[in-house]
UniProtKB/Swiss-Prot annotation:
Its biological purpose: Component of the mitochondrial import inner membrane translocase that mediates the translocation of transit peptide-containing proteins across the mitochondrial inner membrane.
Keyword annotations from UniProtKB, A to Z: Membrane, Mitochondrion, Mitochondrion inner membrane, Protein transport, Transit peptide, Translocation, Transmembrane, Transmembrane helix, Transport
Identification of the protein by name: Mitochondrial import inner membrane translocase subunit tim50
Domain FCP1 homology span(s) in chain numbering: 191-332
SMART domains named in the record: CPDc
Primary localisation category: mitochondrion
Gene: timm50
Biased composition (Basic and acidic residues): 49-72, 81-93
CC annotations in GO: TIM23 mitochondrial import inner membrane translocase complex
Renumbered residue ranges of the record's region Disordered: 42-97
Mode of membrane association: Single-pass membrane protein
Species of provenance: Dictyostelium discoideum (Social amoeba)
């Protein structure tokens, strides 16, 4: 503002006003006297750009290196981004491949839920009034008694039978769960009773026809003589296998032992003394000393330390094995053997013909008189 006033008052003297032309100084302009000439400059005079100094070779090299490094970094970042994108794409593809249909998940969850419910129900049913006495059974109310007798007890027996069969078939069951509980199938031996026990399959003693309503029984040669002599030193038990109907047991027993003097007792398939048509090796269930137990079987030969297999009897055959075997068994009790198993090992896993020969050799070797010669 001050400069404008000065210009107005002394413009002519300074020389800014000439030829009747008036020039006013703007607020942002300044008057300078340069080389005898008057020039008008703005306060915001633009400075001329400075000339760039030439760069040295070292600076150029440094700049080139930095540029190369930046390019490399950019390239690495681009590659990493591409790899991540590829990985994400592959992951999505895998996820899409392994996507489980909803129906499968629903079926699986339903199955496992059913297994859980069934196992819980089975466990509770198995343990329902498991080890109660007869008096406690009598005190059960009507609902408990009906559930106990119609569901719990049959289910428990069914499960125990399956488990025992698996335990017998697969040894690792004993390793996992320990030896099973052995149920005694015979009463305890009487003090001062007979020292040896003989268990005979009915097929080894007789042939039973099933062509009529009333079965016909054919006795093996020398059966009565065989049993009558051995009953003095042996407990003799007759085993009824699963081929014979249960309602025929008493009838057949009466035909074999009319006076009831031969057999100490009877054994049935339910006792488990035979497994898959073979006498069990768990002789402890007889509650007798295993070293003094002999099984006489009619099945195909198999490995068992206590079994003498004499084969099935056929009524049309001339079979005298019982008469040949009798003196051998009598010699065991007469010698008061502590263990019969080493003696009977030479009569195992052989055919009928070989058994007859081995019996004769045993009698001659031990100077035992044959009943057949008498």
């Amino acid at each position: 503002m001050i400069l404008n006033k000065v210009a107005k008052c002394y413009g002519k003297q300074i020389g800014f006003f000439g030829n009747k032309t008036t020039q006013f100084i703007k607020p942002n302009q300044t008057i300078f006297l340069i080389g005898g000439t008057k020039r008008l400059f703005t306060t915001q005079q633009q400075q001329s750009p400075k000339k760039e100094e030439p760069k040295s070779e070292q600076q150029k090299k440094v700049e080139d290196k930095t540029e190369e490094k930046e390019k490399e970094k950019d390239e690495e970042e681009n590659e990493n981004e591409k790899e991540k994108e590829n990985e994400d794409g592959e992951g999505q593809k895998k996820k899409s491949k392994f996507n489980v249909p909803p129906i499968v998940t629903s079926v699986t969850s339903t199955f496992f839920a059913g297994v859980l419910v069934a196992s819980t129900f089975g466990y509770l049913t198995y343990n329902f009034k498991k080890d109660i006495s007869e008096e406690e059974r009598y005190r059960l109310n009507s609902v408990e008694s009906k559930f106990y007798h119609s569901i719990a007890e049959p289910f428990r027996e069914f499960f125990d039978n399956i488990f025992e069969n698996l335990r017998t078939k697969y040894e690792f069951f004993d390793m996992l769960f320990g030896p099973g509980k052995i149920h005694k199938v015979l009463p305890p031996p009487l003090p001062g009773g007979k020292k040896y026990t003989l268990v005979i399959d009915i097929d080894a003693l007789t042939e039973i026809t099933k062509t009529s309503k009333y079965p016909t029984l054919y006795k093996r040669a020398g059966l009565d003589f065989f049993l009558d002599h051995l009953r003095k030193d042996y407990e003799i038990y007759l085993y009824f296998n699963g081929n014979i109907p249960q309602n025929k047991y008493e009838q057949l027993q009466f035909k074999i032992d009319t006076n009831g003097k031969y057999f100490t007792g009877l054994l049935y398939p339910e006792t488990g003394i035979k497994e898959r048509n073979q006498f069990s090796k768990k002789i402890e269930m007889l509650d007798r000393d295993p070293s003094k137990v002999i099984f006489i079987d009619a099945a195909s030969p198999y490995d068992h330390p206590n079994v003498i297999n004499i084969g099935k009897f056929k009524s049309n055959s001339k079979d005298k094995l019982l008469i040949e075997l009798l003196p051998v068994l009598e010699s065991f009790s007469r010698k008061n053997l502590d263990d019969v198993r080493p003696e009977i090992s030479q009569f195992q896993n052989i055919s009928k013909q070989s058994l007859t020969k081995n019996l004769e050799d045993y009698l001659s070797t031990h100077n035992i008189n044959s009943r057949q010669k008498k």
